[in-house]
């Protein structure tokens, strides 16, 4: 009887203690690439509020960054510096979401370059198309 109660107590304790991913759920930061008239496109909030062509974020290790393409153009992503990221296919298309996971501490620089120009897409813009650069400081 004592063994049964001890076994039941251990099982209850083991089930009640979160481990692995549940114990350390990674925060998710959401951003967008949005179309604007000046410079064609910029980084934006998850609600598509423009932030500018360059942006710096400070996040903790394990953070996931999701970037939604709310611009009608395709973009190529490239890592300029920092610990290696799993980029996969560098090209992303309108309406898709790109996810990066920052598993190691360091300073990462990611560049997003539009594949089609604003002229090719028949869009009227002011000035040259921006090349977007995102700096992510991971502590």
Language-model segment annotations:
Residues 1-4:
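Positively charged n-region of N-terminal signal peptides that target proteins for export
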Residues 7-16:
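Bacterial N-terminal signal peptides
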Residues 19-26:
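Sec/Tat signal peptide C-region and signal peptidase I cleavage site
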Residues 26-64:
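N-terminal edge beta-strand
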Residues 27-36, 41-42, 91-139:
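Extracellular/periplasmic metallocenter environments
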Residues 54-73, 77, 97-103:
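Beta-strand cores of secreted/periplasmic/IMS beta-sandwich domains, seen most often
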């Amino acid at each position: 009887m004592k063994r049964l109660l001890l076994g039941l107590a251990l099982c209850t304790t083991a089930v009640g203690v979160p481990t692995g991913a549940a114990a350390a759920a990674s925060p998710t930061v959401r951003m967008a690439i949005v179309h604007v008239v000046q410079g064609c496109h910029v980084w934006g909030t998850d609600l598509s509020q423009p932030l500018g062509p360059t942006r710096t974020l400070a996040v903790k290790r394990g953070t996931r960054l999701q970037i939604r393409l709310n611009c009608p153009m395709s973009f190529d992503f490239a890592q300029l510096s920092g610990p290696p990221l799993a980029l996969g296919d560098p090209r992303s298309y309108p309406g898709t979401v790109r996810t990066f996971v920052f598993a190691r501490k360091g300073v990462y620089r990611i560049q997003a370059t539009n594949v089609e120009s604003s002229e090719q897409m028949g869009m009227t813009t002011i000035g040259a198309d921006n090349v977007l650069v995102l700096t992510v400081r991971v502590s």
